[in-house]
Design a protein with these regions (language model features):
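Class I Rossmann-like S-adenosyl-L-methionine
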Residues: 1-174
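Rossmann-like S-adenosyl-L-methionine
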Residues: 141-399
Length: 399
């Protein structure tokens, strides 16, 4: 059972949840907009309301079973506050209800029966905060000591050599190490994608779907500020702060550029010239359910099919940039086969110049030893690896 919930916070939570259950906009944006309109709520109250609405989204099927299938936001919040999702008789629930997943998603859940439910439970837990230490400015142990001196506890990441996991929810945005570019927020799984690319000093790299540029910054640092990292994205808004972030990180080798789409004519100047290309493709985001639990309710199988068509087009366009002997990494933050191995295997079948290279040995060469797997792909999830859900394939252009 959750701690006592004051009536005024219950009311705010119910109003906000009612908006979220329309599933018209991303939950985090809706929550931020609500708090801007209700600025009188203090930071602690905002945190409690936010935790409650996201808790309701994480456990929505169990709460609906407890409160009644047609229950409105008020009843769902009451069930949440009473801890109904924790005390139910699991035998009265279908497996999809136990997992708090829509039926279609549970039917496609890509883990074996012996771990499928445990993975689903792990995806319902709030995500921890991971940091990446900028190796151009600091060492992990020194950063850990400096944070500890400020009362911020961290532990070293399990896998990535520059990862730190923050204990609790301290305010970090104004910490000197964040301000001077010594640390960046980046999930440990995302950091492993940068290592899988294996960029070396002096190389020419393309981050094809760079987004806000977190992996571009990581790759630029791993190259010790040499070579060139072309950070491309279709959203100029998402790229807008990357130049300033790169400057703060001490990087002069990261070059952001907004492109029209994957077929932008300006990309042709790099055709066949790039050492390594990272494609962190737009996807369903179902590997980020710890952070974005609304995603499991806001989309269905048809959205996966649409995403797969776009992913195939992007992968094909990115492959044109890779020079013979170069590396192409295709990644998503989704566990779904339609967006992952199906896309890669169809691409390789049509492009015999590219071959899949096993991911785990490539990471092991960098001292990153993940649990062994028969798959040539990198697959991460919160149950087995304590990261977000990721898929990655490492391909080499043979000719």
């Amino acid at each position: 059972m959750n701690s006592p919930f004051p009536a005024v916070l219950h009311q705010h939570t119910a109003r906000l949840l009612e908006q979220l259950l329309r599933f018209e906009h991303p939950a985090d944006a809706t929550v931020q907009q609500y708090f801007r309109k209700h600025s009188a709520l203090g930071s602690r109250d905002r945190a409690r309301v936010g935790d409650a609405v996201f808790g309701c989204l994480r456990h929505l099927r169990r709460l609906r079973h407890a409160a009644g299938e047609g229950a409105g936001a008020e009843a769902l919040v009451a069930a949440w506050a009473a801890g109904a999702w924790q005390t139910q008789d699991a035998t009265a629930l279908t497996p999809a209800e136990q997992a708090d997943l829509p039926d279609w998603l549970w039917a496609r859940w890509p883990w074996p029966a012996e771990t499928a439910m445990a993975v689903a439970e792990a995806f319902k837990q709030p995500a921890p905060l991971d940091l990446r230490v900028n190796i151009l400015k600091a060492k992990r142990e020194a950063v850990q000591a400096a944070l500890a001196a400020a009362g911020i506890e961290t532990v070293a990441g399990r896998w990535a050599p520059q990862a730190l996991r923050v204990i609790g929810k301290p305010a970090l945005q104004r910490h000197a190490l964040m301000v001077d570019g010594s640390i960046e927020v980046q999930d440990e799984g995302s950091q492993l994608l940068g290592h899988l690319l294996g960029a070396r000093r002096g190389e020419q790299i393309v981050d094809f779907c760079a987004g806000a540029g977190g992996k571009s910054l990581q790759i630029g640092a791993l190259m010790r500020n040499s070579g060139r990292v072309h950070a491309f994205d279709v959203s100029a808004g998402r790229l807008s702060e990357l130049a300033q972030r790169a400057k703060r990180a001490g990087l002069a080798n990261v070059q952001p550029m907004a492109i029209r789409d994957e077929l932008d004519a300006r990309l042709s100047r790099l055709a066949g010239k790039v050492d390594r290309v990272l494609v962190d493709a737009p996807c369903s985001g179902l590997g980020t359910l710890r952070r974005n639990p609304d995603l499991k309710w806001r989309q269905g199988p048809e959205q996966l099919a649409d995403k797969a068509a776009l992913q195939a087009s992007i992968l094909m366009a990115a492959a044109r940039l890779v020079k013979p002997g170069g590396v192409l990494v295709y990644a998503t933050c989704s566990p779904m086969a339609e967006e992952n191995e199906a896309v890669v295997e169809a691409f390789v079948a049509e492009h015999p110049a590219f071959a899949v290279e096993p991911a785990l040995p490539a990471l092991a060469k960098q001292g990153i030893d993940l649990p062994q797997s028969d798959s040539p792909y990198l697959r991460l999830d919160p149950f087995h690896h304590d990261t977000d859900g990721f898929f990655a394939a490492r391909l080499v252009r043979c000719a």
